[in-house]
Design a protein with these regions (language model features):
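Aromatic/acidic polysaccharide-binding cleft in carbohydrate-active enzymes
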Residues: 20-132
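Generic recognition of flexible, low-complexity loop/linker segments
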Residues: 11-15, 57-61, 120-124, 136, ...
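Ser/Thr- and Asn-enriched, surface-exposed coil loops between beta-strands
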Residues: 116-118, 129, 141-143, 183-194
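Extended catalytic-interface subdomain
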Residues: 1-15, 24-28, 32, 57
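Short, charged beta-turn/beta-strand-edge "cap" motif at the junction between a beta-strand
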Residues: 210-211
Length: 211
């Protein structure tokens, strides 16, 4: 995702024919595809590690939203899908959970992040009304990580919410009709100390109101 965006930025600089044009990228399909066909043709099983990858993929689209106009996740049901079915049951595969989480709770106005952490992929965004900020962190390491939150001159209310997708086993997966091994967990949190702990192999989305 990043490589395609970087290549198109290079084309814009080097090709005179593009100097006066704003041609953006419409990515026709993106997803993982591997493994046995458990849910029919191309009906592969997705694991928690794939959910982490999907979240990081979304992060790259957010960072490059100036040049990506559209990106279509492939697919929806069974065929490399984020929803899996049997004859009588259906349920979210691991990869469907970050798609659902970000769609429901992540902001739409990107915010610049000026720091980097080993094993952590971080993005932030404001909601359309600019009254809330969301911060998303993906921890690809086995160990828990802790970071400090610095919102600069922006005043943040001391209480917030978080949504967490976590499993200590990156190979964990969900089965339709059974209790999910991977799910979205919501909790109220305090931001008074501006410290945040992220479990290993986790996707964490934080929401805070701006005063």
């Amino acid at each position: 995702i990043r490589g395609v965006a970087d290549a198109h930025r290079k084309y814009r600089k080097e090709l005179v024919s593009l100097s006066d044009k704003n041609i953006r990228i419409a990515l026709d399909e993106w997803n993982y595809w591997y493994g046995d066909y458990i849910y029919g043709e191309l009906g592969v099983r997705y694991h928690h590690k794939d959910a982490l990858g999907v979240a990081i993929g979304l992060h790259e689209f957010f960072r490059n939203s100036d040049i990506y106009f559209m990106a279509n996740y492939a697919q929806t049901v069974n065929v490399i899908g984020c929803i899996k079915t049997t004859n009588t049951k259906s349920g979210f595969a691991a990869t469907g959970l970050p798609l659902k989480l970000y769609r429901n709770h992540f902001g739409t106005i990107p915010v610049f992040i000026d720091d980097e952490y080993d094993d952590l992929d971080i993005v932030a965004a404001l909601d359309p009304s600019m009254n809330k900020i969301t911060v998303s962190i993906v921890n690809i390491a086995q160990d828990n990580k802790s970071i400090s939150l610095d919102f600069g001159t922006t005043s943040i209310r001391p209480d917030g919410r978080q949504w967490l997708i976590h499993n200590s086993d990156p190979e964990a997966y969900n089965v339709p009709g059974e209790k999910p091994n991977i799910r979205i967990e919501e909790a109220n949190i305090t931001l008074r100390e501006r410290r945040l702990s992220i479990p290993g192999y986790a996707i964490l989305v934080l929401e805070a109101e701006i005063e």
